[in-house]
């Protein structure tokens, strides 16, 4: 069966994966492709929510409905659900998911409760692990090289911070700096700032790093592959993360983790691993 990927970087995705790729917002091309496909796989992540924007929710609901109307089976895979807060959003979500989606796999019980609150009963609903837990780590030599490139000892003892910009973060940067200083002074752990999203996360890390003074710390550059992020996580003694995937990658490597919740999806995952 031919596979087509929807992405904001079609050329890059085609080069990396060897697959046909369509730009996320090329609607005529998307519709043309769906006419020739048997399955539309939507996911993963928290796509059915309106915190990002109402347009984001409307977009994903449109793709689900369009794929079904063009004759595809429709599956939502590895999803988190909600929050949906804006007027009309819950009703629209209920209508589309009940009429257009055949099956949904959810990554935490909170999302099952959210679908029940919406009144979604049409699709088959399955609770399953987040698929990111199965991603492999980069080879040890690649991880060693990444640490040496920033002057870090591959055999050192580290505490990882995976942070992101969020409204009010600048007022909390000192809290993370104090935690990093405490980890160094009491446990001999050097703070490593690891970007999951290299644009936003690098700025958040810089805000904290400038408050550390003489406390040893390492700023890892981005972007980097998910395999390298996972490999680096595996070298940490503990991971402190705002990023959901920072927590998922740490859990997958058996590394103790501390979640800092800015979004219900982070809280929901932490409940699963508690």
Residue ranges and their predicted role:
Residues 1-274:
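Active-site anion-handling motifs in enzyme catalytic cores
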